[in-house]
UniProtKB/Swiss-Prot annotation:
Taxonomic superkingdom: Bacteria
The name this protein goes by in its record: 5-oxoprolinase subunit A
Record-linked SUPFAM superfamilies: Glycoside hydrolase/deacetylase
CDD domains: LamB_YcsF_like
PANTHER family the record matches: 5-OXOPROLINASE SUBUNIT A, UNCHARACTERIZED PROTEIN YBGL-RELATED
Organism encoding this protein: Rhodopseudomonas palustris (strain BisA53)
GO MF annotation list: 5-oxoprolinase (ATP-hydrolyzing) activity; ATP binding
EC number: 3.5.2.9
One example of a Gene Ontology biological process annotation: carbohydrate metabolic process
Function according to Swiss-Prot or TrEMBL: Catalyzes the cleavage of 5-oxoproline to form L-glutamate coupled to the hydrolysis of ATP to ADP and inorganic phosphate.
């Protein structure tokens, strides 16, 4: 029987401000990626999110991004060096590891956020710096990468275990990169369309680009963004469609 992981980015509020419905999404995901205080999140939110994950038996991962609360980590940082990237990634992983220990859980994986991930998918230096930081902190951590990207290449070169990620609610360009959020149609919202699209990804390892090109993608984990409008309904519909097709959902890694 085929099995797939469903991951979600959570803990992306700050102080009293909340982003998305973490409690509902964590009931539907099998892995979660927790903001570590740079693009969103704080110590209390991190701890609360880890506790929710532990109670549900959900795998926990660090979701490091650029230090950009105002821009939610979705803006590139021109001129940043490889050493600075290594430092900020290691810092955020370590922060979540400490908070997870306090909550009686362990960090199993790392997935870069927003602009950090987008830049790394196309820039060798950024991708290698992220991989180097993960390897230095704990080489057993699974590195979640966009399939067929420079992140994948860097992770392989570093000898890390990889989980190849596809996105349920994002459109793809012909080169297998994600369509920029600045473009119309970049984010998908129809639960039925998304469920059928993901089913094809899981069963056939393929997705149609915005121009209709068939792109082959290895699929280990499917991301559903918790801040996408209707995220809970999308996740419920996806799980139901996968179950209907005889596909189980399970974490790709455990801490």
């Amino acid at each position: 029987m085929t099995s797939i992981d469903l991951n979600c980015d959570l803990g992306e509020g700050f102080g009293p401000w909340q982003m998305g419905n973490d409690a509902a999404m964590i009931e539907l995901a099998t892995s979660v990626n927790i903001a570590c205080g740079f693009h969103a999140g704080d110590a209390d939110i991190m701890h609360q999110t880890v506790k929710l994950a532990k109670a549900r038996g959900v795998a926990v991962g660090a979701h490091p991004g650029f230090r950009d609360l105002h821009g939610f980590g979705r803006r590139p940082v021109p001129g940043i060096t490889a050493a600075e990237i290594e430092n900020l990634v290691a810092y955020q992983i370590g922060a979540l590891q400490a908070v997870a220990a306090l909550a009686g859980h362990k960090v199993s994986h790392v997935k870069a956020h927003g602009a950090l991930s987008n830049v790394a998918c196309e820039d060798d230096m950024t991708a290698r710096a992220i991989a180097a930081a993960i390897k230095a902190v704990d080489p057993k951590l699974v590195f979640v990468v966009l399939a067929s990207s420079k992140l994948q290449t860097a992770g392989e070169a570093a000898g890390l275990t990889l989980a190849h990620e596809v996105f349920a609610d994002r459109a793809y360009e012909d080169d297998a990169t994600l369509v920029s959020r600045k473009k119309p149609g970049a984010v998908l919202h129809d639960p039925i369309e998304i469920a059928e699209r993901v089913l094809r990804m899981v069963q056939d390892g393929a997705v149609l680009s915005v121009t209709g090109k068939l792109i082959k993608l290895r699929t280990d984990t499917v991301c559903i963004h918790g801040d996408t409008a209707g995220a809970v309904e999308i996740a419920r519909g996806l799980r139901a469609r996968l179950a209907q097709a005889g596909i189980t959902v399970a974490p790709f890694a455990r801490g």
